[in-house]
C-alpha cells in the first residue's frame, strides 16, 4: 500500500535529499542551471509551505519516491518538480499516487495551472503525465538541455 506524506520539517529531509540525489544520478544530466546544489541543502526553501509542497511516498514505511511543487512568478501557475520513484518500486502505482496528491495540493492552494518539463527520452514519464491530463505546451523558461518537452495542465477555470 502506498502512503504519501507531506514533508514540512527538517527531520524528514534526509530521505528527501537521498531521493533527490538518486534522481539526479539516474537522470545523468547537468542541472546546475536549476540550482540543484542549493536545493539539496534546503529543499523546503524552494518547495516549502505556504506556496510549495514536498511529498514522499512510502511502501511498508520505506521511502519509495518523491515529488515537489514549486511556486512560479506567473500568478496562479505552479511547477511539478523532481518526480522520482526508486527502481525497485516502479510499476506499483507510486508515481500515480504522487502526481494525484500533488495535483490535489496545487488545487487546494488555488493554482490554476501546473507546468512541468521533462526529456523526450523519458517516455514512461511523458505517458504518465498525459494520463493525468497534461498536454504539450510552449517553453515557460529556458532549459538548455536537448530534447526538452514542456507540458501543462489546467487545474481550475481561468
Explain the meaning of each model-derived region:
Residues 1-3:
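Extreme N-terminal starter segment of soluble prokaryotic enzymes
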Residues 112-115, 119-132, 136-158:
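C-terminal "cap" of GNAT-fold acetyltransferases
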Residues 61, 93, 110:
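Conserved G/P- and acidic residue-centered "switch" motifs that form tight phosphate/ATP-binding loops
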Residues 86-92, 120-121:
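Active-site acidic-Proline motif in GNAT/NAT acetyltransferases
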Residues 10-13, 92, 123:
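Loop/helix-junction capping segments adjacent to catalytic residues or to phosphate/diphosphate-binding pockets
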Residues 6-81, 86-87, 99-101, 105, ...:
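Acetyl-CoA-dependent GNAT
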Amino acid at each position: 500500500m502506498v502512503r504519501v506524506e507531506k514533508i514540512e520539517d527538517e527531520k524528514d529531509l534526509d530521505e528527501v535529499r537521498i531521493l533527490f540525489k538518486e534522481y539526479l544520478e539516474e537522470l545523468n544530466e547537468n542541472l546546475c542551471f536549476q540550482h540543484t546544489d542549493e536545493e539539496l541543502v534546503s529543499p523546503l526553501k524552494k518547495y516549502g509551505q505556504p506556496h510549495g509542497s514536498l511529498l514522499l511516498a512510502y511502501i511498508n514505511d520505506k521511502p519509495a519516491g518523491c515529488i515537489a511543487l514549486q511556486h512560479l512568478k506567473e500568478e496562479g501557475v505552479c511547477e511539478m518538480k523532481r518526480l522520482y520513484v526508486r527502481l525497485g518500486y516502479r510499476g506499483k502505482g507510486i508515481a500515480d499516487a504522487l502526481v494525484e496528491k500533488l495535483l490535489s495540493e496545487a488545487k487546494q492552494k488555488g493554482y490554476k495551472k501546473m507546468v512541468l518539463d521533462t526529456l523526450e527520452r523519458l517516455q514512461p514519464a511523458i505517458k504518465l503525465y498525459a494520463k493525468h491530463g497534461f498536454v504539450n505546451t510552449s517553453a515557460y523558461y529556458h532549459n538548455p538541455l536537448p530534447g526538452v518537452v514542456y507540458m501543462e495542465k489546467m487545474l481550475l477555470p481561468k
